[in-house]
Amino acid sequence: CTDITGFGLLGHCVEMASASGVTFELKVNDIAYFQDAVEYAKMGLVPAGTYKNRGYSIGSVDAQGIEEFYLDLLYDPQTSGGLLLSVAREDLGTLLSELKASGIDTAVSVIGSVAPESDKLIRLLK
């Protein structure tokens, strides 16, 4: 588990995947985005830190076929981001049930899965 601040979602995913010896497969269409942020990213209006974050980890990310604005959003240097949790597949149902019971299920999304380590730590999928 980590909080998404400073390094953007992809930066934190790279750190977690590297430390765990795995590859994260993220589905860009399953990630929630603020609509205004999407529009700004499509216009190229992103924080300068986005480019620094991209430079840090772009070599670890397979983004083939993914539109550029998604990358800008995923490298965005959040200062008040959410939490990223990696949970064993067999524990996912229990976790989702417990989150729902506690009233925080509306802010929960499954955005990908973990695969054996490959040449890239992150694989972005549509």
Protein language model regions, located:
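Glycine-/charge-enriched secondary-structure boundary and capping motifs
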Residues: 1-126
